[in-house]
Amino acid sequence: WKQMSVW
């Protein structure tokens, strides 16, 4: 993942 890690 890339920005999904922020979720």
Curated annotation (Swiss-Prot):
Tryptophan amide carried by residues: 7
Domain of life: Eukaryota
Keywords from the UniProt entry: Amidation, Neuropeptide
A biological-process GO annotation: neuropeptide signaling pathway
Protein name in the entry: WWamide-2
